Amino acid sequence: MVYRKLFFFLFLLSGFSVLAQDKKVETQIATKKKFKTSDQIWNFDVIGAMDFPLADLAKRFGTSYRIGLGIKLKTKKNFIYGAKFEFITGKKMREDSLLYNIKTQQGSVINQQGDLLNVGLFERGYITGLQFGKIFPFLQMNANSGPIMLASAGFMQYKINIFDRDNSFPQLRDEYKKGYDRLTNGWYVENFIGYQYFAENKLVNIYAGFNFLYGFTQVRRDYLLDLARTDNAKRADIMLGFKLGWVVPIYKKNAEETYY
């Protein structure tokens, strides 16, 4: 009788032990499922940025904005390779001499019929280049997300867009307009530091951060009509700002779950 009771006790004890062990294993597996390896992802980006000019660029323009598209490949080791194209737009001018010789004291332009014209001056341009960088995940729950450092290099161009809606001023037509638009271009390098987030459900994928762009540019017009001279000086065009990107990811395959 004593042995039977002892056997029954040991049986119950072993049963509870097995159940507890199974529960522990299930908990470990459930936990491991949450830990994912990094994926290879193709990214199609919609990019928006606000930039503040510095150095030579600040003498010509005020705050500007960028909107563009990009494509990037994120490897399983979280390295990034890509390319982008961005439009530049702005409406604040600081080039005081522009149209000075055909303006009234009130800042308007008079056409041949003696009518006052409010000629619009805007910043227009674009940036295109190649990108390389890396994501540094620090939360094991999502190996695709984390702080990001991205370098870019390529070509930039901008000019002053002179808008004469009625096309009624001869000095602002065709070849004459080129003497005022300050067409400028050259090479640039850009650094971006921010945070990249890829959602587990793949629906919300964004990045945001700060960018610093340095352009090695030069005016490309042979003659500036408002200054009555040429301008061959090398320029340092700097843009410092904030960038936000919306990412449409295409995964090579479904995210793998790693069991330990």
Annotated model-derived regions:
Residues 1-37, 251-260:
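Cleavable N-terminal export/targeting peptides
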Residues 31-41, 77-78, 138-146, 198-206, ...:
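Short loop/turn motifs that connect adjacent beta-strands in outer-membrane beta-barrel proteins
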